[in-house]
C-alpha cells in the first residue's frame, strides 16, 4: 500500500524575477502609511543584476520546505501551457514533490512576479492569472494528514468553499492556514469556515492586526480574537523581535536564531518559518520544538537569494539546533 501523503500544499505558484537595485539609485521614505521605496521617475536607472527563480510562491515554498524536511508532499496548483509552467513543474519534481495534481491551463500564461531587491529588503510586484480553480478528486492514498493553504488569486473565492467542503468530509485532515494578500482582504466572515477549521494559522504582526481587528500593541488581544475565529494554534511573527505562539493553554515567545552573517535578502523568511513550524508538528514535535525549528530555517533562507535556496534538510536543521546558544528557547509571556 502506498505511503499516505503527509502534506498537501494549496496555492498559486509563480516565477520570481529579482532585480537587484543599486543602493544609491533608490532610497526609503516613511510616513504614517508605511515605508516607501523611492526612485527617480521618468528616466533610465542602472541596476546591479537580475535573477530568475522558478516555482516559488507561499504554497510552493511550503511544499519545498516540507519535502526537504522529509515529509511526503504533493501540491494542488495551476500553471499555464508555456515554458515557464513546464519549468515550474520540473522544479517541483526535482524537489521530490508529487505534481500529479498540478493543472496545466490551455492558452493561459504562468504567474510571474517581479521583485525589487533593495539592500536586504524587497518589494514584490504581484499579478495572479485568472485560472479556473476547482478542487480535484483525491484517491484514498492522495488524502493527506495535513493541508497547507496559502496565497491564491482574488478570483478564487468559490474555490475556498470547495476546499472547506472537502475538509468537512475529511475531519481527520489538519489544516494549516497562512493567508495571502487576497485571502486576508476577503475578510474573516467570508472565509470563516477556513479560519474555524484551522489547526494552525501563521501571520506576521501587521497581518494579525488586520485579520483580528485587534490592537497591534496588544498581542494577547490579537491572540484572543484569532482563537475566537476557531484557530487552535496561532503564531504571530514579529521581525527582529522573534515570534509568539498560543495554543489556547500557553503562550510562548521565541527569539530569532542568530544570523551567522548579514542577511542577503529576506524573501521567503516568513514562508520558511510558517512551513517549518507546520512540518515540525506534522513530524510529531511539540509546540516548543516547532518554535525552535522554525527560526533556524528562516535564518538559513535569508543567507541566500530567494525563498528556497536556503531551505534545510532535517539533518542540517538539527545540526544548527545543536549549535544554538543557551538562550535560544521558548519562554512564557
Residue locations for each model-derived region?
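Glycine-rich phosphate/adenosyl-contacting loop at the front of the ribokinase-like
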Residues: 1-74, 86-87, 333
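Conserved phosphate/ATP/ADP-binding segment of small-molecule kinases
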Residues: 164-174, 180-253
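Conserved phosphate-binding/catalytic region of the ribokinase-like
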Residues: 1-8, 26-27, 216-333
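Structural alpha-helical scaffold elements that stabilize or flank donor/cofactor-binding regions
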Residues: 7, 139-140, 191-194
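Active-site metal-binding loops of divalent metal-dependent hydrolases
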Residues: 12-13, 152, 272
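A glycine-rich helix N-cap at a beta->alpha junction
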Residues: 91-108
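Conserved phosphate-binding/catalytic loop of the ribokinase/pfkB sugar-kinase fold
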Residues: 100-104, 113-158
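A short, aliphatic-rich alpha-helical micro-motif
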Residues: 2, 141-142, 195-196
Amino acid at each position: 500500500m502506498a505511503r499516505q501523503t503527509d502534506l498537501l500544499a494549496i496555492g498559486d505558484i509563480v516565477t520570481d524575477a529579482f532585480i537587484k537595485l543599486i543602493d544609491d539609485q533608490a532610497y526609503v521614505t516613511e510616513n504614517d502609511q508605511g515605508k516607501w521605496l523611492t526612485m527617480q521617475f521618468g528616466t533610465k536607472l542602472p541596476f546591479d543584476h537580475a535573477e530568475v527563480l522558478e516555482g516559488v510562491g507561499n504554497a510552493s515554498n511550503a511544499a519545498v520546505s516540507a519535502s526537504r524536511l522529509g515529509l511526503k508532499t504533493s501540491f494542488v496548483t495551476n500553471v499555464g501551457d508555456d515554458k515557464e509552467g513546464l519549468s515550474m513543474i520540473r522544479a517541483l519534481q526535482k524537489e521530490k514533490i508529487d505534481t500529479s495534481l498540478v493543472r496545466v491551463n490551455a492558452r493561459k500564461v504562468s504567474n510571474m512576479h517581479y521583485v525589487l531587491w533593495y539592500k536586504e529588503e524587497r518589494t514584490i510586484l504581484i499579478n495572479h492569472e485568472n485560472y479556473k480553480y476547482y478542487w480535484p478528486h483525491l484517491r484514498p492514498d492522495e488524502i493527506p494528514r495535513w493541508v497547507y493553504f496559502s496565497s491564491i488569486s482574488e478570483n478564487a473565492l468559490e474555490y475556498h468553499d470547495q476546499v472547506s467542503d472537502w475538509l468537512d468530509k475529511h475531519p481527520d485532515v489538519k489544516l494549516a492556514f497562512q493567508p495571502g494578500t487576497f485571502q486576508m482582504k476577503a475578510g474573516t466572515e467570508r472565509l470563516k469556515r477556513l479560519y474555524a477549521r484551522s489547526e494552525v494559522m501563521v501571520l506576521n504582526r501587521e497581518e494579525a492586526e488586520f485579520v483580528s481587528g485587534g490592537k497591534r500593541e496588544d498581542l494577547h488581544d490579537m491572540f484572543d480574537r484569532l482563537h475566537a475565529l476557531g484557530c487552535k494554534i496561532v503564531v504571530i511573527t514579529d521581525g527582529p523581535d522573534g515570534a509568539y505562539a498560543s495554543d489556547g493553554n500557553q503562550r510562548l515567545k521565541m527569539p530569532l536564531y542568530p544570523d551567522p552573517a548579514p542577511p542577503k535578502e529576506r524573501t521567503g523568511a516568513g514562508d520558511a518559518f510558517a512551513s517549518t513550524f507546520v512540518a515540525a508538528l506534522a513530524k510529531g514535535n511539540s509546540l516548543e520544538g516547532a518554535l525552535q525549528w522554525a527560526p533556524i530555517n528562516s535564518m538559513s533562507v535569508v543567507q541566500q537569494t530567494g525563498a528556497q535556496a536556503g531551505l534545510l534538510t532535517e539533518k542540517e536543521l538539527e545540526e544548527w539546533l545543536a549549535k544554538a546558544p543557551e538562550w535560544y528557547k521558548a519562554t512564557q509571556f
